[in-house]
Amino acid sequence: MSNPIRKTNARLVDVISQLKAQSRDTGAAVWRDVAMRLSKSRKNWAQPNLSRVSRYAPEGATILVPGKLLGSGELSASHSIAAYSVSNGAREKIEAAGGRIMTYSELMNENPSGTGVVILG
């Protein structure tokens, strides 16, 4: 039996439930991994900067951030990035580089199996 979700943020509880359901339906472990990371305390969430995205993600990759993406650094290539939250500075820099920001549900609709998704955080 899984642990109950003890979050009070209704949006976050809904996102975690969607991720777990997608993992059950498709058998893709990537969605379950992100759901478990978001179920943890918020102080333990990933908060990578754009410089980390530029450093570690291959060009044109689909990146999944289980937390908040921050705007320090420059983005050298266009990426599709899904994150729970994105700072305003990061949003501007991603769009200026020709990248795309999407929600977890948009990413799950486009890539249900989660193949080729890079978890950064």
Annotated model-derived regions:
Residues 1-121:
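Extended polybasic, low-complexity segments that bind anionic RNA or targeting/receptor surfaces
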